[in-house]
Amino acid sequence: FFRLCDTGVVGLILGQVIGRWGNFMNREAFGEYTDNLFAMRLPIDAVRQHEITETMWAHVTEGVNYIQVHPTFLYESMWNLVLLCLLLLYWKHKKFEGEIAILYFGGYGLGRCMIEGLRTDQLLLPHTNLAVSQILAGILVVFAIVVEVSVRTKKTQV
């Protein structure tokens, strides 16, 4: 089962690398206004009006018909591509069956936790500013660390 999990996450993360580009095609899952190197311009009429924040509107000047935002789909796609490469490089050095899957969960959760903070369409816990996806991603990271440490500790005790 754990060998199957290791193999399955490789296909899963490759699907995520490719699938995030669907967010670009749909003009969704972007971040707040930015003027950094990776800033992406979206035509205002191609974006749902409720997704344009006050900060974005503040940077729209007369005669300009676009918003300039963080391309969070690109950040996540690139993060997942790097994670995929690292997992494939580590494959021959794994210490136990299922370790690649655990490392994927931890790495994906870490990236998602950071990138999700840039997005403007977050689902927040009621009466808080906490994004549900960031909390779940954080739990995934903690879970991965606990499992990795506990399995390695048990292996060294044998």
What are these regions (language model features)?
Residues 1-158:
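A feature for loop-to-transmembrane-helix boundaries and adjacent hydrophobic helices
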